[in-house]
């Protein structure tokens, strides 16, 4: 049996393999039923990891009402292929119309910012990594399950996973929205440098949100300091520090475009 981590009395976490890192699913309990947050990456994840995880927590097929997909990327939504046949009565909650179209034979609903699920979990839209990124805020314990929405400096690993934010202007606005919410804990889908997968207490939450802006600010500085360099050359400069996660040149390009179109202020 894989390790299960208890976040609160009603929020539990387990990790699943993905490339040379991992991804995460969360089980969220309420008096009205349960929610699975994300669905893993691969077809076999449901049978190997997710079903045993839910069973260990005593969550039956009848009790599981929803699977909430934080965004339509493989390591979060790819496991639906194996999951939905095992839990055919669950409703998929997503911001992605494309994801809904992939599974027309199953029930799905498109979520909206501020929507309350099972009287307990509030949808918080946090675009940036993707346009459809969203998390769930437990209004009882003030715990935000953010998935990939809040990435701090990024993920260490073989990939270029540093601050993978391709909609920087929208992300800065969303982070400021989150900053104004009453949040005392953030838990994420991956270990994000430098804070890992969780921030406990208001001070740690603020530091986590500050860390989400820092890489974007550093990219801005490079673009302004070296206007003659293209995105690939700036990528090399950003990635010079071996201790930091590595950024994609497309992320720097997205920041450059936002600056040129005056959609983002100096950070």
Task: Tell where the protein language model's regions lie, with residue ranges.
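Conserved beta-strand hairpin/beta-sheet module of binuclear metal-dependent hydrolase folds
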Residues: 2-57, 135-147
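Alpha-helix N-cap/loop-to-helix initiation residues
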Residues: 20-21, 43, 73-76, 194, ...
